[in-house]
């Protein structure tokens, strides 16, 4: 029934298996990729015809993580996979970026690439496997894909590169780098690093490129066994005559437009030239009109690229290494915890930093289960930033991707949660854009955190590099404009500190670049980053020592683990009382770390003292402030040190006699008490009478000690016999004759109600003690 084809290789200490012919057989190409016990299915389908009037390549990539792959049921009300998560969006882009340039120009058939994680073993990450499966499925599908590509993840630990490291390896190491490459050159790089040098980063890319060659060979072997017949491409029409006509018509207009340094003026001039070209083909067929528009764009690219390669002159008049003018301003917004306005040429970002408590952390539900992220960065790109009318609302894939890139750049310099126990949210609202808005987000975000008082290791700056490549001639350009991005061959973003690189992202629009070009771009980017750091330092060169007056304060303390339940109380009673009474928020971790937060330091101090009182042990002889919680006939129970209870006996309330406890004390009354004794069961005996209730100072004990009452000679009581265990009254021995107490008849009988030396009978005495026997 199945015509299964399979290829296996040993790769990075694991067996990589590529299989087709058993699952999703109606797709144009479907591959089941397995690494360890992680399994990803990728299916490719392509439309056989192009929609009328379509002049772009509609490639759509969807990556989906099935919860059953790790034995989990989705959380929340809806128990099924729903819209794409942030990770799914990022991996979809990771697959899309290296394969899109490998389709021929003029191919406009719609293609769907759908990758689904079917099994996840917790060690082998499915994103790399999804990239490999997508490449293999496209290669065997018959569509005009100029691949295949290979992919690899590289870590760096103890001076050595690691192929396909586990999550634990990445966390313990200094690098998490993903590379996609063809046989000849690198196509895409995505990375996060802990301030590594350019040499180490370049070495990691080359290491990944070499490792991906084994994957490419395996895909080619699978294609030799199972590839479908390649599609026949329609011959491209000869447009040389139309191109010559357009060059004569609008060539000079385009050249003049690109000499205008102002973006708005340049756009207006270019639109006029395009309208002029379109008018010249008004009588042509719709297909010819579309072709003419494409030719105008090609003319624009030729003019810009030639000026850069031959003359070294760019659109705005800069040379290839110069960075646009920079203006940075810290504390731009008065009420934000931290803020900055960062402007580089015609690109501008308002960046803010907001500090929160643990309860503000972002909950992330994924294949590995629930986890919480205390650092967030949200990038927003409204349509007005480019002077256009457009959709305004939820972030798209591009915004999610740009935000994550800036997140990686800044994540490496954050303090640990122990050093700075705040939740940090950065936002970047792009108010102007003409290239490299994600790197403006990095610079603005770094300044905003410093303004908020976040103790980052060092400031971070970022720069976007471009490439113009014609044959063997190339020019690497620093701080690219939007037009240079569109018309160039590479978008290469590098961010880092004065000590090294923290993130690097590269997208190639041609069939890859060489090691020489890559090295040149890295070194030129280092020069640009250093310049930008200098400009940022003019606005703020150090982290502020004080937090904003509007930011919450968090104090951290540690308590013994066995005291956690005492702080929480039965059903959370104690901790709720602490929060309700003091107004501070209290979070307790399983390791005994307690975080107390409030914008009022007095509230923090009150909660802290309360908790200290719960976990501390009372000391005999010390004086504490407490609250009366219960009155009984023989005294009062007082709660002190937050969670401790002790008894003040009626005799220890005052130096003078107290007839009724309720006459001297009331429930809820605050009192000062001294610890007299703690018995071996932990019972605490307290005294109020030796403490000044106004000042809390100890008073001298003026009460005379109780004298022993003489009991007289009780005489020889005789042999009481051996004592045995059990009821003494029932089984006790002979106590001997009783001493003669004499005739009581000559003494008057005392009435119990009259009292005597021992005072009146207490009110609570039972009836048989108070009744009249006469």
Curated annotation (Swiss-Prot):
A GO molecular function held by the record: RNA binding
EC number of this enzyme: 2.7.7.8
Keyword Transferase: yes
Sequence segments annotated as region (Disordered): 689-774
Record's keyword terms, sorted: Cytoplasm, Magnesium, Metal-binding, Nucleotidyltransferase, RNA-binding, Transferase
Cofactor(s) essential for the protein: Mg(2+)
Subcellular location(s) of the protein: Cytoplasm
Bias kind Basic and acidic residues: ranges: 700-755
Residues covered by the S1 motif domain: 621-689
Annotated CDD domains: KH-I_PNPase, RNase_PH_PNPase_1, RNase_PH_PNPase_2, S1_PNPase
Signal peptide interval: none
Keyword Cell cycle: no
InterPro entries linked to this entry: ExoRNase_PH_dom1, ExoRNase_PH_dom2, ExoRNase_PH_dom2_sf, KH_dom, KH_dom_type_1, KH_dom_type_1_sf, NA-bd_OB-fold, PNPase
Pfam families for the chain: KH_1, PNPase, RNase_PH, RNase_PH_C, S1
Residue ranges of every copy of the KH domain listed in the record: 552-611
GO biological process: mRNA catabolic process; RNA processing
Catalytic activity: RNA(n+1) + phosphate = RNA(n) + a ribonucleoside 5'-diphosphate
Family, as annotated: Belongs to the polyribonucleotide nucleotidyltransferase family.
Protein name stated in the entry: Polyribonucleotide nucleotidyltransferase
Species, as recorded: Rhizorhabdus wittichii (strain DSM 6014 / CCUG 31198 / JCM 15750 / NBRC 105917 / EY 4224 / RW1)
Gene this protein is translated from: pnp
């Amino acid at each position: 029934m199945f015509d299964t084809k399979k290829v296996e290789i040993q790769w990075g200490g694991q067996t990589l298996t590529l299989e087709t012919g058993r699952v999703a057989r109606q797709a144009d190409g479907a591959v089941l990729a397995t690494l360890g016990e992680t399994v990803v299915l990728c299916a490719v389908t392509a439309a056989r015809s192009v929609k009328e009037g379509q002049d772009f390549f509609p490639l759509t990539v969807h990556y989906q993580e099935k919860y059953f792959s790790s034995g989990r049921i989705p959380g929340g009300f809806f128990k099924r996979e729903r819209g794409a998560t942030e990770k799914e969006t990022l991996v979809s882009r990771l697959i899309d970026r290296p394969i899109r340039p490998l389709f021929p120009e003029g191919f406009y058939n719609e293609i769907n690439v759908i990758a689904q994680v079917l099994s996840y073993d917790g060690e082998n990450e499915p994103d790399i496997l999804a990239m490999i499966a997508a490449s293999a499925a496209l290669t065997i599908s018959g569509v005009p894909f100029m691949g295949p590509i290979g992919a690899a993840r590289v870590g760096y630990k103890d001076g050595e590169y690691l192929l396909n490291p586990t999550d634990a390896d990445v966390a313990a190491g200094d690098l998490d780098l993903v590379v996609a490459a063809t046989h000849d050159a690198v196509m895409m790089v995505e990375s996060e690093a802990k301030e590594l040098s350019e040499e180490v980063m370049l070495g990691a890319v080359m290491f990944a490129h070499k490792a991906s060659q084994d994957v490419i060979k395996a895909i080619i072997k699978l294609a030799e066994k199972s590839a479908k017949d390649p599609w026949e491409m329609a011959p491209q029409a000869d447009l040389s005559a139309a191109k010559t006509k357009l060059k004569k018509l609008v060539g000079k207009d385009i050249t003049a437009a690109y000499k205008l340094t102002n973006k708005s003026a340049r756009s207006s001039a270019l639109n006029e030239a395009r309208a002029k070209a379109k008018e010249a083909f008004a009588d042509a067929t719709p297909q010819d009109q579309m072709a003419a528009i494409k030719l105008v764009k090609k003319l624009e690219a030729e003019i810009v690229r030639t000026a850069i390669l031959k003359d070294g002159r760019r659109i705005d008049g800069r040379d290839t290494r110069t960075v646009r003018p920079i203006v940075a301003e810290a504390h731009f917004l008065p009420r934000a915890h931290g803020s900055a306005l960062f402007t580089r040429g015609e690109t501008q970002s308002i960046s803010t930093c907001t500090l929160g408590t643990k309860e503000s952390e972002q909950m992330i539900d994924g294949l590995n289960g629930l986890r919480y992220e205390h650092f967030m960065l949200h990038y927003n790109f409204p349509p007005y930033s480019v002077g256009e009318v457009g959709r305004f609302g939820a972030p798209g894939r591009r915004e999610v991707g740009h935000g994550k890139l800036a997140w990686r750049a800044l994540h490496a310099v954050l303090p640990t949660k122990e050093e700075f126990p705040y939740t940090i949210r950065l936002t970047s609202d792009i108010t102007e854009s003409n290239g490299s808005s994600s790197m403006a987000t990095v610079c603005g975000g770094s300044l905003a955190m410093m303004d908020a008082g976040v103790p980052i290791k060092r400031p971070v700056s970022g720069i976007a590099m471009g490439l113009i490549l014609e044959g063997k001639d190339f020019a690497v350009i620093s701080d690219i404009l939007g037009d240079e991005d569109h018309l160039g061959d590479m978008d290469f973003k590098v961010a880092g500190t004065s000590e090294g690189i923290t993130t690097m992202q590269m997208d190639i629009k041609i069939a890859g670049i060489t090691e020489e070009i890559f090295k040149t771009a890295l070194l030129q980017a280092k020069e640009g980053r250093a310049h930008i750091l200098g400009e940022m330092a003019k606005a703020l060169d150090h982290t502020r020592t004080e937090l904003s007056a509007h930011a919450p304060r968090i104090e951290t303390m540690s308590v013994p683990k066995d005291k956690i339940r005492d702080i929480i109380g039965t059903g959370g009673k104690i901790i709720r009382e602490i929060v309700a009474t003091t107004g501070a928020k209290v979070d307790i971790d399983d390791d005994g770390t307690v975080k107390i937060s409030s914008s009022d330091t007095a509230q923090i101090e009150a909660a802290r003292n309360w908790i200290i009182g719960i976990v501390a042990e009372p000391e005999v002889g010390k004086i504490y402030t407490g609250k009366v919680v219960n009155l009984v006939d023989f005294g009062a129970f007082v709660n002190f040190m937050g969670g401790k209870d002790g008894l003040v006996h009626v005799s220890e309330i005052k130096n003078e006699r107290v007839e009724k406890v309720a006459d001297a004390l009331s429930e809820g009354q605050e009192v000062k008490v001294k610890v007299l004794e703690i018995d071996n069961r932990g019972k605490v005996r307290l005294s109020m009478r030796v403490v000044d209730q106004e000042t809390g100072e100890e008073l001298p004990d003026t009460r005379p000690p109780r004298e022993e009452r003489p009991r007289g000679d009780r005489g020889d009581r005789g042999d009481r016999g051996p004592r045995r265990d059990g009821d003494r009254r029932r089984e006790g021995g002979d106590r001997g004759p009783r001493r003669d107490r004499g005739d009581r008849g000559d003494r008057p009988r005392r009435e119990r109600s009259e009292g005597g030396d021992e005072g009146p009978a207490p009110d609570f005495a039972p009836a048989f003690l108070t009744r009249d026997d006469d």
